[in-house]
Structure formats: C-alpha cells, structure tokens
Amino acid sequence: MNTLEKQNEEHPDFQSLIKLIDDENEYIYENVKDKFLSYGKDSMHFLKDYFDSDNPSVAERSKEIYDIINFNFLDKKLRDLSYKENFLEEAAFTIASHEYPELDYDNYKMILDKMAIDLKEQIEAKYADFVTVYDKVKMLNNYFFYEKVFKGNTRDFYEADNSYLNRVIDRRTGNPISLSLVYLLIAGRIGIKFSGINIPNHFIIKYKDDIDEFFIDVFNFGVIISKYEALNFFKQFGIYEKDFDNIPFLQNAEEKDVVFRIFANLINVYENEPNDKKVEQLKKLQSYFG
C-alpha cells in the first residue's frame, strides 16, 4: 500500500473533500478547508499531490490550506520553544521549515553529529594526550572552512536562503548569524561552548573560560580576535580594560536574541521583495522571542 492509499484509508474524507475544494460556493469551500485543517499534517501530505493540478482552483486552494496548516504548526512549535531552554538549534531549523515544510530536522542533526565526530577523530589523532581550546578551534577552522568549504555569501548577502539553516548546510554558505550558528553547533558537539555576540550590522561569537577569552568572526573565515587585540581596537574610542566587560554590544546574546535577529533578517528580505503575507507571518513568529 502506498502512502496516498494509506492516508485515504485512514481519512476517507480526503477524496470527497478534494472533489469539493474548487466549489464556487464560498461556504462550502470554508467547510472543506476547516475539515482539512482538522487533520493537520496528514492533510499536508495529501494536498501536496494537488499543487500541480490541471485545475488552477484546486492547485491554488490546496496550496493555501497546506500553507495555513504549516504555519499553524510552526506557530505552536515556536511559541512552545520560546518558554524552554537550549532551544536555539531546534528553533533555527523550525524557522527554516516555514519556507521548507518538508525539512527533515533529524537528518540535519545527523549531518551535524557526523561533522563533529569526524572533527573529534582528527583532534584525537593529532593531540593524543592534551589539547587546548585554542588548538581545537584552529582545527575546527581548518575543518569548517577548508575541508567542508563553508564561506560567507558575499555575492548575494540578502538572499533569504542565507538565513535558513538547512540551506546553509546544503550550500555551505550563509550570512554572519547562520554561519556562526552552524559553527557553534559543531563546536558544542565537541565540548566547546561559544556565545553569540550581536554587534551592530554583524554577528560574531565569543569563547570565555577562566583562562582564555577570544572572539571569532565566522563570516570572515574564522578570524580569531584575542581580548588583547579587541582592547587595543577599543582604546581609540576611549574604552579601556576596566570598561571592556560592560560594552553593551559585546555582551553574550541570549538564545531569544539570536532567534529574534534571524527573523529580523528574513523580515527585511521579504519586505524588500515585497511579500506582505510572509512579513506578517514572520513578525508574528518573531514576537514570541521579543
């Protein structure tokens, strides 16, 4: 039994509903829509087969209902995530499923896991006994930028796909936030905890423990900036070491802040298209993290 036959067996309404989906009577269509909505994601799998229908009304309305179901799912998912802790990875992939509803999060988790395993094996092969965080970061840079060939998308900086984590991993390119996010997700899997830093018009990450403190500009091929180098830079603006830890835009960004900014980037893209419907939806989803 194929997938469609299985769905029809579980929901015998589907075939009768699809026959009525193009009805000119708006009342009938609204009832058909409500019925499909009640079946949730099962309806999405069914309706997708009608996107290319020869009947334009069937195709248009199938897509309309499909999009409503997907948005309702994302709305609940992101609202629930906003109350949890350590949600950044899942939230980023959930945002991507707004544009790519068929996205398989488990598959991308496995890709990130595999990258981390490969990198960890390389580190262990080179440093059998002891390895510093700085040495790990240098190997991570080599793996990320030269083996996996991730790079900043300077050619089409404002492309929407730069903000969708699945596409960043698929294409090996993205914007400062998305590239930094993939980088720190791999780093976290090998025991290095980075924090995001929301600096104006850019995004970098920071590592800090009792011994080390440094910044990494992932978008610019993982340039490592020591605290000493950062201090020297800020001295020209009259900011000295005693004030360094209180510089507002060098504070660790909370996960909500990072998610909010991912949405802000996407909203900017779709406002410029323009795509009012997407902007409205993204602003609603963004509001859970404001």
What are these regions (language model features)?
Residues 1-290:
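A structural boundary/capping signal
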